[in-house]
């Protein structure tokens, strides 16, 4: 078996373990989850899990990294999009992708369970902190290095703005979970509006124009 095939097979097996762990978290939460639970969910052996992960925290880190990669992909791809319409229209389409991703019910339950564990588990808290820092670094560097971008915003301020936008999305997850009777269609629409307006407000201030003027830019 060649190295490429071996690597692909190993990655598929690793992914199956991560997905089994996510299903376990959705069922019973993270705090009492054991590797034996994950092996049972996967239909494999405990020894097979140890071939890929030394402990539960390493699996949690893999779950967090996968979510972070997903968020970065949406952000970077949206930043490179040069579709038709105004800046405001393209930004709205971009923010819609974020909101829909964060309103995914399964992903929300896993993310909230991990966040709850981070409150009492310092290692999990460090995993989330490192993932967040990587997220802000990648996105802010992408914006700064994009030759088509001319927003004169200092990197530290940009990262603070990213953190606040992310906090709205994280809060959206919690709201959807703990307010099951809320109109999700309205919640989605309001979240998109708030994100679009907030980002346009930050950018318009750096350009010395109004939000309305900036939203009409090509």
Predicted regions and their residues:
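Hydrophobic alpha-helical connector segments
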Residues: 62, 75-108, 155-165, 188, ...
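C-terminal peripheral helix-coil segments that are non-catalytic and often amphipathic
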Residues: 1-2, 137, 141-145, 168-218
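Helix-turn-helix
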Residues: 16, 20-58, 62
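Short, basic, alpha-helical segments at the C-terminal edge of helix-turn-helix-like DNA-binding modules
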Residues: 35, 65-71
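Amphipathic alpha-helical packing segments from all-alpha helical-bundle domains
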Residues: 89, 103-112, 122-149, 160, ...
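Solvent-exposed, amphipathic alpha-helical segments
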Residues: 16, 20-27, 70, 74-78, ...
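Secondary-structure edge/capping motif, primarily at the C-terminal ends of alpha-helices
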Residues: 79-82, 119, 176-180
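Short loop-to-helix capping motifs
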Residues: 55, 117-122
């Amino acid at each position: 078996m060649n190295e490429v095939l071996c690597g692909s097979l190993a990655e598929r097996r690793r992914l199956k373990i991560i997905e089994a762990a996510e299903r376990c978290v959705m069922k019973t939460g993270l705090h009492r989850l054991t590797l034996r639970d994950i092996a049972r969910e996967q239909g494999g052996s405990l020894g097979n899990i140890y071939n890929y992960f030394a402990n539960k925290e390493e699996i949690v880190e893999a779950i967090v990294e996968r979510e972070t990669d997903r968020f970065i992909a949406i952000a970077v791809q949206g930043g490179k999009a040069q579709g038709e319409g105004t800046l405001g229209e393209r930004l709205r389409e971009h923010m819609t992708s974020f909101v829909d991703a964060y309103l995914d019910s399964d992903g929300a339950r896993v993310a909230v369970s991990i966040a709850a564990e981070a409150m009492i588990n310092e290692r999990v808290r460090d995993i989330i902190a490192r993932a967040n820092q990587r997220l802000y670094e990648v996105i802010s560097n992408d914006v700064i290095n994009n030759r088509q971008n001319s927003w004169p915003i200092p990197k530290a301020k940009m990262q603070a703005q990213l953190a606040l936008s992310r906090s709205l999305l994280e809060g959206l997850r919690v709201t959807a979970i703990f307010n099951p009777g809320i109109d999700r269609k309205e919640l989605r629409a309001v979240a998109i509006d708030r994100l679009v307006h907030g980002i346009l407000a930050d950018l318009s201030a750096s350009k010395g124009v109004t939000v309305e003027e900036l939203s009409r830019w090509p």
